[in-house]
Amino acid sequence: MSAKVVLDFEKPLFELEAKLHEMRECLRNTTRDQSPADADLLYGDIEALERKVELLRRSIYKNLTRWQKVQLARHPERPYSLDYIYMMTTGFVELAGDRHFSDDKAIIGGFARLEDEAAGFSQSVMMIGHQKGRDTKTNLYRNFGMAQPEGYRKALRLMKLAEKFRKPIITLIDTPGAFPGIEAEERGQAEAIARNLMEMAQLTVPVICVIIGEGASGGAIGLGVGNRILMAENSWYSVISPESCSSILWRSWNFKEQAAEALQPTAEDLLAQGIVDRIVPEPLGGAHTDPDAMGATLKAMLIEELQQLLPKEPQLLVRERIEKFSAMGVWNEV
């Protein structure tokens, strides 16, 4: 069994939880000849420590810095695209290949059914997302979630297929960036991403994009042009990672916390700036602490958005999408 991953700011909480676990084990192993008073005293200590743990947990996770949210977005136990697909949909059929070069395992996609009997909703959708690995072997297989040009071309092929059959598209974004290797550049990485932006803007079906973890630069925006942009509470979305920004501005990664503050990459920041439309709330401590609850929350929000988008005419969807992205950013005319 792999060891629990504890982030640096979580260590005080982890230490208290470990102490609480020890006390519970001590109570469980209490022998019959111990006095009731001793057991009552231990019960009282446990209850007091439980309250302290809960207060500390809320204090930590309700006051996260931007850099701490970046760390949570990268948590190795966090749900990935395939996890969400299997939690939210049924009948997922993965489709492979870009029909030009190869099948990029860093991007997955295929048709699935999104349904909620209580809401009276059932809809076939195209699910597309970045996919990371859980260990060294699967991370190498998935290229750490960094897509090659063929990955973006595969995604576009699936989007055009969904458009042909009039199915809405849902993209799940979670990448440290597009793969920066020489071979990716030789095969047209920039062109592949740019073409996705152009083509996604003109799709005549509803497109919903969800940042579920990391949303780094062109690697993220290559799947990020939609009618609705949703963002998980503890995810980040920016033109550059805090570490890379730090290395460029200060010639060192030691200023990543300051870079994160300057970049303002969190869901709250981007909602205020009008970049994203809704924040997907996470369980206290992050999506990985209760993946099922996180999946249910996201599923409900996706159904809400689709119920609003599906009745719209194709040309209205295109016009609203283009207007949405045209309004982003700040510039001066001279």
UniProtKB/Swiss-Prot annotation:
Residues covered by the CoA carboxyltransferase C-terminal domain: 48-308
Enzyme class: transferase
PROSITE patterns: COA_CT_CTER
Pathway assigned to this chain's UniProt record: Lipid metabolism; malonyl-CoA biosynthesis; malonyl-CoA from acetyl-CoA: step 1/1
InterPro entries cross-referenced by the UniProt entry: Acetyl_CoA_COase_a_su (IPR001095), ClpP/crotonase-like_dom_sf (IPR029045), COA_CT_C (IPR011763)
Primary location class: cytoplasm
GO cellular component, one term: acetyl-CoA carboxylase complex
Molecular-function GO terms, alphabetical: acetyl-CoA carboxylase activity; ATP binding; carboxyl- or carbamoyltransferase activity
Biological process terms in GO annotation: fatty acid biosynthetic process; malonyl-CoA biosynthetic process
Subcellular location field: Cytoplasm
E.C. numbers: 2.1.3.15
Biological role: Component of the acetyl coenzyme A carboxylase (ACC) complex. First, biotin carboxylase catalyzes the carboxylation of biotin on its carrier protein (BCCP) and then the CO(2) group is transferred by the carboxyltransferase to acetyl-CoA to form malonyl-CoA.
Family of the protein in this entry: Belongs to the AccA family.
Subunit-structure text: Acetyl-CoA carboxylase is a heterohexamer composed of biotin carboxyl carrier protein (AccB), biotin carboxylase (AccC) and two subunits each of ACCase subunit alpha (AccA) and ACCase subunit beta (AccD).
Name of the protein in its database record: Acetyl-coenzyme A carboxylase carboxyl transferase subunit alpha
Taxonomic lineage: Bacteria, Pseudomonadati, Chlorobiota, Chlorobiia, Chlorobiales
